[in-house]
């Protein structure tokens, strides 16, 4: 078996076809893989997707051309959830504003809010949403999770939306 290693992103369909030509297995990150690519790569049987989003992969075309998918869904859920919690706390406490004022040599009593006083709305409850719920529970905030249809109602009910 021949192993080829490429460490650069290719974005055009012709560059993708050229790079994956005669390969049975390939790992993609941001490359768009659709039917126009797959029909010209008959040797390709497995695509490993680096990262979590599948929006760049045409799953119907993969099935049509009998190409298998290797995917690590949820692999980054903790880092994304932690970023959401830390960003919410920083925004509620107005930390960025306070930091800027201190750097200018000024100090104001910044009145922020505590996460425990808020209602946090989570749009979708996939890998990240479920992990975010786990991280928010110790803050004793009200948590609403919903795969929503009516954004207006959802916006009205929440202080923090993730």
Where are these regions (language model features)?
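Short, hydrophobic beta-strand segments that form beta-sheet elements in well-ordered domains
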Residues: 5-8, 25-28, 47, 142-147
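Acidic, amphipathic alpha-helical patches
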Residues: 13-16, 34-37, 111, 159-160
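Rossmann-like dinucleotide/phosphate-binding beta-alpha-beta segment
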Residues: 110-162
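Glycine-centered tight turns that cap/initiate beta-strands
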Residues: 22, 43, 159-162
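A short, charged, Gly/Pro-tolerant segment at domain boundaries
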Residues: 101-108
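N-terminal glycine-/charge-rich "phosphate-binding" loop or analogous flexible N-terminal tail
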Residues: 1-25
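Phosphate/diphosphate ligand-binding glycine-rich loop within oxidoreductases
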Residues: 25-99, 113
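Short, polar loop motifs at secondary-structure junctions
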Residues: 1, 31-32, 147-152
């Amino acid at each position: 078996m021949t192993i080829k290693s490429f460490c650069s992103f290719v974005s055009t369909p012709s560059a993708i076809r050229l790079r994956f030509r005669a390969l049975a297995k390939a790992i993609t990150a941001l490359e768009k893989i659709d039917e126009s690519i797959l029909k010209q790569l008959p040797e390709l049987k497995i695509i490993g997707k680096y990262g979590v989003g599948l929006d760049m992969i045409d799953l119907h075309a993969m099935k049509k051309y009998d190409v298998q998918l290797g995917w690590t869904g949820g692999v980054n859920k903790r880092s994304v959830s932690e970023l959401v919690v830390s960003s919410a706390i920083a925004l509620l406490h107005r930390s960025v504003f306070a930091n800027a004022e201190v750097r200018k040599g000024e100090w104001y009593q910044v009145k922020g809010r505590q996460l425990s006083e808020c209602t946090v709305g989570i749009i979708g409850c996939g890998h990240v949403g479920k992990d975010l719920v786990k991280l928010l529970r110790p803050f004793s905030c009200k948590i609403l999770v919903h795969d929503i249809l009516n954004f207006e109602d959802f916006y009205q009910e929440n202080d923090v939306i993730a």
